[in-house]
Regions:
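Polybasic low-complexity intrinsically disordered regions
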Residues: 1-187, 192, 197
Length: 198
């Protein structure tokens, strides 16, 4: 796993944990969790590291603190409903394996992280995709436009935004009926990204 990828995961883990801790009343937090809110903690955790081994240890620390926080709030329905806690509940199993025998979470290798796993603590719908050798984090947009030479102006006739793990052809297939109904479409020209075997 490259340092850049690992640093990104560590930063994401910090953001998720911090949001979850801020969603909790301070009086239920142990000191180990309160320190995450200190400004110096972020600097020490994310930037004062020596090598991949230390980064993995810090990532494991974030997972452990998050798992402990979920145990602390598990009987508090009012807190479990909060956004920061919901994000943490999703994040931990995406980033770690649970060993039922040891009752511990262990950080997953980068290759074991699913493409639809959380990429941002602030926008949980953002996904990761490696498309044609290029890495993309975010969403994908498909736009349909008129393209007849006789039109004085070409007009956007349809657009769709979705998780970027969805293929172009799948998005077109979902929107084609609507586009045809709205535009009286007779011919459709597409780029190579929309091709797929049926």
């Amino acid at each position: 796993m490259t340092n850049i990828k690992l640093a990104g995961r560590l930063s994401l883990a910090y953001d998720v944990l911090r949001q979850a801790i801020k969603a909790c009343p301070v009086d239920i937090l142990p000191d180990s969790h309160k320190k995450v809110l200190d400004p110096g903690y972020k600097t020490d955790t994310l930037y004062r590291l020596k090598g991949t081994g230390e980064r993995m240890a810090r990532l494991q620390e974030m997972i452990d603190l998050g798992a402990e926080l979920l145990i602390i709030v598990e009987s508090r329905a009012d807190i479990l409903k909060r956004h920061g806690i919901a994000i943490l509940k999703r994040f931990i199993p995406e980033q770690a394996y649970y060993d039922f025998g040891k009752k511990l979470w262990t950080v997953k290798d980068n290759k074991d992280i699913a493409a639809n796993s959380m990429q941002s603590a602030y926008d949980p719908d953002v996904t990761y995709r490696n498309k044609s050798g290029k890495r993309h984090v975010g969403a994908v947009t498909n736009i349909s436009v008129t393209c007849a030479d006789e039109n004085p102006v070409q007009v956007i006739t349809d657009y769709t935004v979705d998780k970027n793990i969805k293929g172009d052809s799948e998005m077109l297939e979902e929107r084609l009926k609507c586009i045809k109904e709205r535009t009286n479409l007779t011919d459709l020209n597409i780029d190579g990204g929309f091709w797929r075997k049926h």
